[in-house]
Amino acid sequence: MSIDNSLKAFKEAQNLIPGGVNSPVRAFKSVGGTPLFIANGSGAYLTDIDGNRYVDFVQSWGPLLFGHRDESIESAVIEAVKHGLSFGAPTQAESDLAALVISMFDSIEKIRFVSSGTEAVMSAIRLARGYTNCDDIVKFTGCYHGHSDSLLVQAGSGAATFGNPSSPGVPADFTKHTLLAEYNNIESVKKCFSDSKDVACVIIEPIAGNMGLVPADKEFLRELRELCDANGALLIFDEVMSGFRASVHGAESITGVKPDIVTLGKVIGGGMPVGAFGARAEIMAKLSPEGPVYQAGTLSGNPVAMAAGLAAITKLKQNGQIISVLNSRATRLVEGMQEAAKTYGIAMQIDTRGSMFGFFFNEKPVKNFADACNSDEKLFALFHSKMLKEGFYFACSLYETGFISTAITDEMIEDTIKASAKVFKEITNV
């Protein structure tokens, strides 16, 4: 398999774009390879500029629930473009998509659209602070909530600590109001509330996707809800990644825990840049122009993105059973790969939620970021590069989640399992 054209394109891009990419994970640094430059996507497949074709388990990092170039979404976008790209004024499509999402989430009575998941989370936290008149936020080590300054915080030793910036360019003053807790450890959250009497909100990925796939325990989420209620803090579920993938009705429908605010992204835009945050009407009433908490965006709710999102979410609501079908395929995939790994003496931990899947080369189950960090990154990098050569495109980082789309068939799943067995055999014979 030749990737000469990708090598050339990457070299050129590095002279023009920092690191050659517009989002760091795309650089393949975690797996030690060269990023593939993509020419097109169709259904379950990506084709690179060298003509190599891959079954795509990344799906643009989650948005493409129906695969590449879904006919109904593509048609909706083309029709919308005919009427204009952006107006900077309200359109009916915004209300239509809002009503659709509200009908699918019990916790959402009103919703505001933005252009990215980062914006959604940033705005949700500002809203929580404005609603509670408190400043501090609690987040969890290993949970990613976008790249806004207050959320780029390193972990401490595992106990809850006041945060320090994890990126140059983020002043310590910006993160001093961010407290860190350990995922799936309620005692660490209690310590945060003990350390601060000014907590506005606790933000969590109920199904974490950026330390690999690590779902929160239901009992942990229940206790988190109780802690927030007891301390007058809001509970935010960041479902930018898991929203509409783990369940049609959100993580609240499978955990039994209802958040105060939900953030959404990825699938809600059908492949176009859309984010959103929603809550009960009482909380959303604090948002401008109805209330004093300011939030705005030139391209928020733009008609093309709304058309794509409306087509995607309408199709999902009309075919809600597909989540269980995709979960069956995701489960078959990781169980098949786990069995193949076991045959060659390789330990693999697996999990799925809806159309999301994850695996770790680890002896023990993964419950938090520290567990994830104990996984074999070198083995993952080798597995990734060899699976690429077999024609299967997995996320280029151990700490990312995989995705199944409706375009990926049972036959493709079986082919992937067979390829993984071949790769594991090669790895153990190295």
Curated annotation (Swiss-Prot):
Its EC number is 5.4.3.8. It comes from the Bacteria. One of its GO terms (cellular component) is cytoplasm. It is found in: Cytoplasm. Its cofactor is pyridoxal 5'-phosphate. Pfam families: Aminotran_3. Gene3D superfamilies: Aspartate Aminotransferase, domain 1, Type I PLP-dependent aspartate aminotransferase-like (Major domain). The modification N6-(pyridoxal phosphate)lysine is found at residue 266. GO terms for molecular function: glutamate-1-semialdehyde 2,1-aminomutase activity; pyridoxal phosphate binding; transaminase activity. The keyword DNA-binding does not apply. It catalyses: (S)-4-amino-5-oxopentanoate = 5-aminolevulinate. The keyword Protease does not apply. CDD domains: OAT_like. Pathway: Porphyrin-containing compound metabolism; protoporphyrin-IX biosynthesis; 5-aminolevulinate from L-glutamyl-tRNA(Glu): step 2/2. It is an enzyme of class 5 (isomerase). Keywords: Cytoplasm, Isomerase, Porphyrin biosynthesis, Pyridoxal phosphate. Transmembrane segments: none annotated. Coiled coil: none annotated. GO terms for biological process: protoporphyrinogen IX biosynthetic process. InterPro entries: 4pyrrol_synth_GluAld_NH2Trfase, Aminotrans_3, Aminotrans_3_PPA_site, PyrdxlP-dep_Trfase, PyrdxlP-dep_Trfase_major, PyrdxlP-dep_Trfase_small. Belongs to the class-III pyridoxal-phosphate-dependent aminotransferase family. HemL subfamily. Homodimer. PANTHER family: GLUTAMATE-1-SEMIALDEHYDE 2,1-AMINOMUTASE (PTHR43713), GLUTAMATE-1-SEMIALDEHYDE 2,1-AMINOMUTASE 1, CHLOROPLASTIC-RELATED (PTHR43713:SF3). This is Glutamate-1-semialdehyde 2,1-aminomutase. It comes from Sulfurimonas denitrificans (strain ATCC 33889 / DSM 1251) (Thiomicrospira denitrificans (strain ATCC 33889 / DSM 1251)). The gene is hemL.
